[in-house]
């Protein structure tokens, strides 16, 4: 089956100034009518190199309770490596279409890895204005290089180096999030899969859209991961639902955007909140982002941490295998 990519649709749409009907959101979702433009609080920005650990733990815990999202600076990933990550990803999406299709996700695949466009339509038959590439970058046992682009030639080395630095940042985040719950530093990481946690990289490619007022790059959702660590490009688009309204996330060069995902919300028994977010698109510019989803291995059972549950704080979530949670979420079934 030949799948039409959004990149190709965008080229056609650009010439006639319209977009196909399946990309036009219902009015209650359209960015033009639902984005809040008044004075709004900003997503917290946290210096990960703060020498006062108590203050750092407090800031991260507060942001995770109140927002479910924060940006981190001074995280230790070299800015030139982030630039390279962005450059090789952009180069891949600028390759001829037939070269990209070599990496396309097999139609019968149970896994999300590969190049693609969201195949399943949403509940109302709508589509998102985005193409993507998924592949795992860690641990080595989970990597399938069949889905790693061979062009540009530096793609593999850059992504492997990025994964190496990313692991250090992730370990710090898990430690501070654990301490913020009043449990020992290693608890959350261990409960989410320990050293077997899978790092799933996704590159989102949102081409210019002639009607950004009507379309969305990604519909409102929470991430099914434990944590998501995201690098955006300079084109704004990430929006967060806070205080009953959609507000724009500010772009901070070289910062990492950290999303609390569903699994951390479950492990924390609701103390930390998975962030509801969506992506808007731009009329003239291509937006791209590089989230890494930190996911428990498929058979890991995730439920509220026993240290956080007692008679006064009963469990708010069922414990279940991550693969079962994912299946329910992706198929829009109740948990």
UniProtKB/Swiss-Prot annotation:
It comes from the Eukaryota. GO terms for cellular component: cytoplasm. Its EC number is 1.14.11.9, 1.14.20.6. Its cofactor is Fe cation; L-ascorbate. InterPro entries: DIOX_N, IPNS-like_FE2OG_OXY, IPNS-like_sf, Iron_ascorbate_oxido_reductase, Oxoglu/Fe-dep_dioxygenase_dom. One of its GO terms (molecular function) is L-ascorbic acid binding. Binds 1 Fe cation per subunit. It catalyses: a (2R,3R)-dihydroflavonol + 2-oxoglutarate + O2 = a flavonol + succinate + CO2 + H2O; a (2S)-flavan-4-one + 2-oxoglutarate + O2 = a (2R,3R)-dihydroflavonol + succinate + CO2. Belongs to the iron/ascorbate-dependent oxidoreductase family. This is Flavonol synthase/flavanone 3-hydroxylase.
